[in-house]
Amino acid sequence: MPPTQAESVIKNIIREIGQECAAHGEIASETVVAFMVKAVVLDPSNGFNMDRTLIKTDVQKLVKLCVARLLDNKNPSLDTIKMQVYFDMNYTSREDFLEEHHRVLESRLGIVSREITDNRASAREELENLYRKIVSYVLLRSGLGSPTDIKIVREATAALQSVFPQAELATFLTLSKKDKERQLKELTMIVTGIRLFNRDCGKGGEGIDDLPAILHEAIPTTTQHIDSQLQIAQDQAFRYTAILEKVTNNPLMAKELQPYMLKEALYNVRQYEIFLQTVLSDIITCAEEVEMMIKQLAAQLEQLKMAVKSKTAVPTSQVFPIFVALASLWMSFQDETVLISVLSNLTTNLELFLGTHELLFPEKVMLGLLDGVVVKSDLTRIEEHMEERVELADFRTQEWLFPETTANFNKLLIQYRGFCGYTFAVTDGLLLPGNPAIGILKYKEKYYTFSTRDAAYTFAENPDHYIHLIKEKAKKNAELIQLLELHQQFETLIPYSQMRDVDKHYIKPITKCDNGTQTDTHILPPTTMRTYEWNEWELRRKAIKLANLRQKITHSVQTDLSHMRRDNTSQVYPLKEASTQSKREGSSRVPRPQIFIAGLRGGQSKTTYGVKVNLTRAVDET
């Protein structure tokens, strides 16, 4: 069957089921009906084949079963499914809610903004009308009073005129549409800051609620109410768990109590508890944000008072940023107020899905079932087995995580919302809290906790078997898919709010161990930049030199001695050490000079004549 045709068939089935329920006086939303259709098809006891196209008899059977389950107002399972659908359709995370809230405000202001930015006023009356529209826009965007209240309008107009006189409208009209929108937002922030400052000084603030005081009173009240509801839900869950524990050990009693739907009631109250914890976590975050913002508000107002004091004129560059920061802070107070209101209403509406407990289990019935039963809290059950610990030596192929060896131990995403998977599988649906101190089993990149060490050992022997049992149990009770977070195993029933997290990877454990490493003193060779200059004046001189070179001309001159010069290269063999040895040593002796002078004694003549006689032997004389 083509996808479009299949969708058409499903829509017709949902419409027919809704009409049947309406005929019996029960109004069921399309979302609840669609969820119930998938739940009935998943239940193997109904005999539907997921791989085969539905024929007419199958459709009639499906409609009949869905209508019967939707009209069974005494079934806690139906209340749990309705609760899950309601919470999924009405709850969003804090970030998503604030983002959507701001988007809605922008869309509502779009019409007023376009009336201002598209205006082509020229006459005096038209300009005055445009200025009034700007005042209304400022009031609507800031949320500080109604634009129909004369006192509030006068106060806002006076604040606006102090920063944006009507004479500047002509300049404003010459701006582009984008610049106009930006200036309108800036004017809103500044005017809001001025009005808040005047309110703090006792000179204005008409129509401005004391949001810090309102939040300071509303948050503790809401928190106390949720805490009390959470305590009641937990006490009820502990009582149901104690009775079911007793029933597990007594088969005869199990048959007697089967019509009471104890397990379905336990799932209902556990789901309610989980939703309350989610809402309470958001409210605690709100309380922390509000506490921080109250301190910031006091600091901003004090800074503004110090800047203004008794001065007649203050530079805009000094006070405008503070006005903007003050307005931004106040808008955050408004966001927190809306968020607290939504969460409070959500909590109140969740209580509507708990009506079956009073019908099925009045106090007299509960006291009879609790006879001889010890009611234990989740904390008590965990403390009873705190000393138990899985021995790693017993498991060579399984990986176990412990608090002292895992850095992000408390951030791991535990399967089945932290309930013991083994107990749930072998007792046909009993929910007992897992004790992480015993050890967390890591199997196929998923993490499992157990109520006792014996449960951990047995589950670890064949995890796939127990995982399959849990999946089959969830097919019979569709509310378990969201309660135990089995969305990856049933992708057709993933809540809309969790669709974006389907492909999100699980947090991987960061294991800790004692280890030592040694590195070289200098891993990389030293790099010294010879051309590096830290002095900016030296860099400036180099820049000027390079700039001057662009204006220079190169001249060449040749002389008689240089015109024949050219670049020359030569290649030589590298130096090497060499030595020689002669066969014999020889020497030679030169003749000794023998020079004589004759006639020194004189003679007969008066004049003496000396004669030099060289008798030195020749060199080559043998």
Curated annotation (Swiss-Prot):
User: Mind listing the UniProt keywords for this protein, alphabetically?
Assistant: Cell projection, Cilium, Cilium biogenesis/degradation, Cytoplasm, Cytoskeleton
Which residue spans adopt a coiled-coil conformation according to this UniProt entry?
none
Q: Name one GO cellular component term.
A: motile cilium
Q: Which PANTHER family match?
A: CILIA- AND FLAGELLA-ASSOCIATED PROTEIN 206 (PTHR21442:SF0)
GO BP annotations of the record are:
axoneme assembly; cilium movement; regulation of cilium beat frequency; regulation of flagellated sperm motility; sperm axoneme assembly
Q: What is stated as this protein's family in its record?
A: Belongs to the CFAP206 family.
Q: Which Pfam families match?
A: FAP206
Reported phenotype of the disruption mutant? Mice postnatally develop hydrocephalus, show impaired mucociliary clearance of the airways and are characterized by male infertility.
In this chain, the stretch annotated as Disordered covers 568-593
Name this protein carries in UniProt: Cilia- and flagella-associated protein 206
The listed locations are: Cytoplasm, Cytoskeleton, Cilium axoneme; Cytoplasm, Cytoskeleton, Cilium basal body
Q: What is its main location?
A: cytoplasm
Respond yes or no to whether keyword Cytoplasm is given for this record. Answer: yes
